[in-house]
Amino acid sequence: MGPRGAPLLVVVLVLGLHALAEGEKPSPCRCSRMTPSNRKNCGFPGITSDQCFNLGCCFDSSVAGVPWCFHPLPNQASEQCVMEVSARENCGYPGISPEDCASRHCCFSNLIFEVPWCFFPQSVDDCHY
């Protein structure tokens, strides 16, 4: 392999590792708590549930007119904290620290502005594929 082949090999290895990392089946809460109207397509027409899960995506064919294979909600430290931002119920105050939020036994995520950063957890009993 010549000097021009080495960068290509690096790209192939990086893409392969990225594919392996993304091929993990998401948790049930990351899928079932996604509102159908907010689903972002992650597959192709006719994709099977196994193919979809192998892409690291969610699959639900029970709702017509929306993607059946879709990107999951973001991962959280606890399954109880996985939810759409519209479902967050405030558990703190503006500017609360992650430590103060945790002392209230609540979830913390400051990635999105103008929504509660400290919010009550939800039961995982309703999570399913």
Curated annotation (Swiss-Prot):
Keyword Repeat: yes
Role: Inhibits gastrointestinal motility and gastric acid secretion. Could function as a structural component of gastric mucus, possibly by stabilizing glycoproteins in the mucus gel through interactions with carbohydrate side chains.
Origin species: Rattus norvegicus
Expression sites by tissue: Expressed in the digestive tract, where it was found predominantly in the stomach with highest expression in the antrum. It is secreted predominantly from antral mucous cells into the lumen of the gastrointestinal tract.
Residues of the P-type domain: 29-73, 79-122
GO CC terms of this entry: extracellular space
Gene for this chain: Tff2
Protein name (Swiss-Prot/TrEMBL): Trefoil factor 2
Subcellular location: Secreted
CDD domains named in the record: Trefoil
PROSITE patterns registered for this protein in UniProt: P_TREFOIL_1, P_TREFOIL_2
